């Protein structure tokens, strides 16, 4: 049995297979996921799992070079933006429009769907390198 924080085998495989610059989207329950993009659906019910907890666990194993969030996140859900900043304190953040974020989902290696019910609670984690 794994000793590290992340136990989900699908997420572990995804993170182990990432290359520099690959993107992983962690989204709320309502984020549209393009049919051609891999969907990893963790949503059990409203609020479970929450987005920030999901980011915390994924970031414990993923080298994150930068994070992208929608401008609307800070405007409509500042507690999500602040929480992401606390979880990823040394990670640069870039803001894009919500429409741009949705379009970037097509280029992502996967979209991880959470049970989050907060507007604009989505983040794209861009993989870095550990050397």
Swiss-Prot record:
<dbReference type="Pfam" id="PF05025">
    <property type="entry name" value="RbsD_FucU"/>
</dbReference>
<protein>
    <recommendedName>
        <fullName>D-ribose pyranase</fullName>
        <ecNumber>5.4.99.62</ecNumber>
    </recommendedName>
</protein>
<keyword id="KW-0963">Cytoplasm</keyword>
<dbReference type="GO" id="GO:0062193">
    <property type="term" value="F:D-ribose pyranase activity"/>
</dbReference>
<keyword id="KW-0413">Isomerase</keyword>
<comment type="function">
    <text>Catalyzes the interconversion of beta-pyran and beta-furan forms of D-ribose.</text>
</comment>
<comment type="subunit">
    <text>Homodecamer.</text>
</comment>
<dbReference type="GO" id="GO:0005829">
    <property type="term" value="C:cytosol"/>
</dbReference>
<feature type="binding site">
    <location>
        <begin position="120"/>
        <end position="122"/>
    </location>
    <ligand>
        <name>substrate</name>
    </ligand>
</feature>
<keyword id="KW-0119">Carbohydrate metabolism</keyword>
<dbReference type="GO" id="GO:0048029">
    <property type="term" value="F:monosaccharide binding"/>
</dbReference>
<dbReference type="InterPro" id="IPR007721">
    <property type="entry name" value="RbsD_FucU"/>
</dbReference>
<feature type="binding site">
    <location>
        <position position="98"/>
    </location>
    <ligand>
        <name>substrate</name>
    </ligand>
</feature>
<comment type="pathway">
    <text>Carbohydrate metabolism; D-ribose degradation; D-ribose 5-phosphate from beta-D-ribopyranose: step 1/2.</text>
</comment>
<dbReference type="InterPro" id="IPR023064">
    <property type="entry name" value="D-ribose_pyranase"/>
</dbReference>
<dbReference type="GO" id="GO:0016872">
    <property type="term" value="F:intramolecular lyase activity"/>
</dbReference>
<dbReference type="InterPro" id="IPR023750">
    <property type="entry name" value="RbsD-like_sf"/>
</dbReference>
<feature type="active site" description="Proton donor">
    <location>
        <position position="20"/>
    </location>
</feature>
<comment type="similarity">
    <text>Belongs to the RbsD / FucU family. RbsD subfamily.</text>
</comment>
<dbReference type="GO" id="GO:0019303">
    <property type="term" value="P:D-ribose catabolic process"/>
</dbReference>
<feature type="binding site">
    <location>
        <position position="28"/>
    </location>
    <ligand>
        <name>substrate</name>
    </ligand>
</feature>
